Curated annotation (Swiss-Prot):
Family the entry assigns: Belongs to the PCNA family.
Domain of life of the organism encoding this protein: Archaea
Xref: InterPro entries: DNA_clamp_sf (IPR046938), Pr_cel_nuc_antig (IPR000730), Pr_cel_nuc_antig_C (IPR022649), Pr_cel_nuc_antig_N (IPR022648)
Plastid is among the record's keywords: no
Name of the protein described by the UniProt record: DNA polymerase sliding clamp 2
Protein purpose: Sliding clamp subunit that acts as a moving platform for DNA processing. Responsible for tethering the catalytic subunit of DNA polymerase and other proteins to DNA during high-speed replication.
Length: 256
């Protein structure tokens, strides 16, 4: 055995992986002494996804050597759905047998209930070298994750794109569709749903509603808040922190 990782909350890897399943065909999981990480571009080169589980935040983590595991997400899609919110997930990598396995069992441990084991061959996946993005952000805010998802769902009713404008004292979300249909929400500095607004001057850009919803629909179950960073007509960065790690998505803007 090369790696063993025990997640105390199975819902955390489940929802994070469900985002990856929606946005990526395949990727490489990297196991090191610091923990588990994944960094990949979506097929359209529009979104950069970065997921980390910290070794110190896992219930148990052992590693013989740094290990890379190629995963085709369609092969694990149905298994991931089987992880209950209160169940534990144990991930095991056996390099000698060239397999990785998921063990799903009750919160109280293997000894007290049914243990479900799913095993898969490790596949060779091309790991694209991704340089650090030289992106600076002129504006940022934090928002209740469920509120952001509700806003995106509202805008999705009328448009494929959402314009986000951050001013020193408020955040405006707006979508305009065919026939002049529009949806708009404004959250001011004293709103109970938005926090820590930071902007020297107004910054605005448009982004794909579908892509943002693919992320927010799952990650709202892991993080109460999401940090949003953007600049005028530049990429947006969403950062979700949760008990065992952090998920970051950087998404290119719409260019009119």
């Amino acid at each position: 055995m090369s790696v063993r990782a025990l997640f105390p909350k199975g819902k955390e890897p489940r929802y994070a992986f469900e985002v990856l399943i929606r946005m990526l065909p395949e990727a490489v999981l990297n196991f090191s002494s610091d923990g588990i990480s994944l960094k990949a571009l979506d097929p359209t080169k529009t979104a950069l996804l970065d997921l980390t589980f910290y070794a110190t935040a896992l219930e148990d983590y052992s590693i013989d050597e740094e290990t890379k595991v190629g995963i085709i997400f369609t092969t694990i899609k149905d298994v991931i759905k089987r992880i209950g919110a209160t169940e534990k997930l144990e991930l095991e990598v056996d390099k000698e047998r060239n397999r990785f396995s998921f063990y799903i069992y009750p919160k109280k441990g293997r000894e007290v209930g049914l243990v479900r084991r799913f095993s898969f061959p490790i596949v060779q996946v091309l790991e694209e070298e991704i340089p650090e993005l030289a992106v600076s952000f002129d504006a940022s805010f934090e928002i209740d994750s469920a509120v952001l998802d509700d806003i995106l769902a509202m805008v999705d009713e009328v448009s494929d794109w959402i314009q986000i404008t951050v001013s020193p004292d408020k955040v405006l979300f707006r979508g305009v569709g065919e026939g002049g249909k529009a949806a708009e929400t404004e959250l001011s500095y004293d709103s109970e749903s938005v926090f820590n607004i930071s902007a020297g001057e107004a910054a605005s850009a448009k982004y794909s509603v579908e892509m943002l919803r693919d992320i927010s629909g799952k990650m709202k179950s892991l993080s109460k808040r999401v940090k949003v960073e953007l600049s005028a007509n530049k990429p947006i960065r969403l950062t979700y922190e949760f008990t065992s790690g952090v998920f970051t998505a950087t998404i290119a803007p719409r260019v009119d």
